[in-house]
């Protein structure tokens, strides 16, 4: 007897997630569904011999029913006699006619998922269908004909018109082909059907409901309009503090800031009233509290007039010793070459202001302008700690609402207190917390940010990742003068604003913005193109230069894929590309007997600035890698929300919008092709990046000619204008670094040059006696050559140097690495003066963060294991809700991100895999300890949690260790590790975490005890099992 159980295919990734949604009544594989049909007909599966032939196909198709589906309809039709005559196309036409003639609007909406679009008035007697996509082809597969033969025409028609049908790709994504668009379930219901205390809320009664108190945005708005909108519950990003070059010579807030604007014309109370409205908008608070808040703001407006910014800035953040003399000497050298000024750049970049000094200046400001009773005692100390934390945050970190409010007790704030009964105290206390949150948010997002912008330039540094550095504006002003003098000699020319305005009108772009990233002895100029484009009517549009180039960018992505696939040149674009080529080379090298290898690495100097724009334009127009026309396809992608955890013990279905989030993504398809969405996803080189998602193609594909997409790219490269320090400049050389298309353009340009000069490296020989096997890769500007012939390596260097001289670019010869000595007779040609300048590598070759063993070709990541280097890449952004889940996700990301290739037998060894594990455990361990410290600090005063914190931190280590090992064994092809390695793996993990947590034993003493006890138990169990085995 057949049993209807959910087999392995029924519990596959996103399919399981689909079952958890309220809108989906049932979701099965087609295989399980046919078994259900068989049971309904009281037949044996032996009558359906063809089912086993299509089992794999049937298990990769999912059929789901909406929640309003009537199961009885299925049973009635399933028991009817089976007829499967006629052609599939005729049957599908009948289904379409049935849907068109239906009076139910939802039936006609199903046409969208079938690849059609309804045209004409819905009240008309006839309708027109236009093809959206090729999804209708999906049902013309032989397997579907076999399914139709098994279940009959009538049941197939029912399946086609009433079910949602998905096909699963090899990456676990479900592509929808039938039924109402699954994305319709994400739409927010406009009707407010949630009951409030005292009866249902009245939609026609504005601002009457008690729940609207803290959520209205204007006089006419009310809570009901915003029930599903998370209003103002989070801090804004700190990005405003970065890269502000405006130099305020008055040593106060900028003139337009509300703290100093109109200070002589409008009274402090009136200005305070305006600021209060800006902070609280139209949300209601009790009158006495409102008056107190306005009074506090007015007090701050009065006190800021007397605050001596210059004195406290000099006191807290002094300029370097003898700054005036140093400044004058450096400014006298502005017109020297960049190389001659390198030591002065190094000196200036070292003049960072310590975070403690910045914190002290901000705290001095608030000590002087805040009313003394605003925050007192412990509350004041905790506020100052939050200022310190805010200053120390990395570039992508921010303080969440709960972290901003924690440890500040509103009951200790005298001016917020109110006399009330114990019964009503909760409501007033809740209001006080809300008011304090709004005030603190305003203080940090407006005052703290404005103070930093006025007096400091904030930036990251090269190779320091997201760590932030503060420079006094006086120092940064000198850096800008020196850098712009260098840039004007190299790539920029100053222009008048009138020329820029004409350029904006003619080409419709917005000028970019230039910023500088400090390096050790120089700087890296980065252009950003986030400014909105102003149209001919002088109205600001929603488009930026990058978004305007979106379709062109999609077209160039097909060029990138063709370059890698054909191949053309030697460019690679990501680590997956690198590892594919590397693995192919290692296999060839092993086939020819693992002969001696020769290594060479080179680096293009100023890669983007060295691109010849005229040649690039010619290359783009004449290349055969670009099709003459393109289709732009738009896909709707439904992704799981990563922070949602399903409780298997207390499971209940929720709405789809609670589990999933949607986004739209576009992809370009070459004009000579018109593949289905499924075919696109099965192509390894597709750019949709849709793994384990739900996806639908629900819009008509747009047609474009190559020339129309290419011209905007050529225009912006040849005529690029930027804004820097209040002046406009035109780029005279190279392509913009920071434009969305620049990396592909640069790679294509150098690949075209490589084709004519380095093609000899493709002539390989697999003769074991004289093997000639080569691997050449270039990631942006970094070359790596591994070859079995020393002559190839020498010729490679000489050819590239010749190409660079012919095309006006240079190689940084200081970064030239070889595994063999170069001929002294060619030093002058290579740009070297002596033997000492040769960089001969031994044992390991380092390239783009990968260390390669030069004898075995085994790999391991090149991870900085200094504590400072480890922590500068850490972004905490702690979540106070489900914090243990946040902690677990953090540890998983530290250990399991981008590590797949380092544990495959085909390209590494067990010894190197263990070295990689050691590095991951050290790096991940220190990051995890920092996160655990944040977690512990947040909950240590929570009596219910405090006793469990250390145990939770330890449990997460156990859980993630098991998940990590399972991932290494089950998810990696040709993995180094097997199940037999698990005991040693777990013990090694515990050993590393014990050592790391022991460095902060005064905080994590109990964690160390728990981990040591677990280690001892594992060793005891291991010994016990060995004794039993011997016996």
Curated annotation (Swiss-Prot):
The keyword Nucleus applies. SUPFAM superfamilies: DNA/RNA polymerases. The keyword Nucleus applies. One of its GO terms (biological process) is telomere maintenance via telomerase. InterPro entries: DNA/RNA_pol_sf, RT_dom, Telomerase_RBD, Telomerase_RT. It is an enzyme of class 2 (transferase). It holds the Pfam family RVT_1. Mg(2+) binds at residues 603, 781-782. One of its GO terms (cellular component) is telomerase catalytic core complex. It is found in: Nucleus; Chromosome, Telomere. Gene3D superfamilies: 1.10.132.70, TERT catalytic subunit-like (1.10.10.1970). GO terms for molecular function: metal ion binding; telomerase activity; telomerase RNA binding; telomeric DNA binding. Residues 498-852 form the Reverse transcriptase domain. Keywords: Chromosome, DNA-binding, Magnesium, Metal-binding, Nucleotidyltransferase, Nucleus, RNA-directed DNA polymerase, Telomere, Transferase. Its main location: nucleus. It catalyses: DNA(n) + a 2'-deoxyribonucleoside 5'-triphosphate = DNA(n+1) + diphosphate. Its EC number is 2.7.7.49. Belongs to the reverse transcriptase family. Telomerase subfamily. Component of the telomerase holoenzyme complex composed minimally of the catalytic subunit p123 and the telomerase RNA template component. Telomerase is a ribonucleoprotein enzyme essential for the replication of chromosome termini in most eukaryotes. It elongates telomeres. It is a reverse transcriptase that adds simple sequence repeats to chromosome ends by copying a template sequence within the RNA component of the enzyme. This is Telomerase reverse transcriptase. It comes from Euplotes aediculatus.
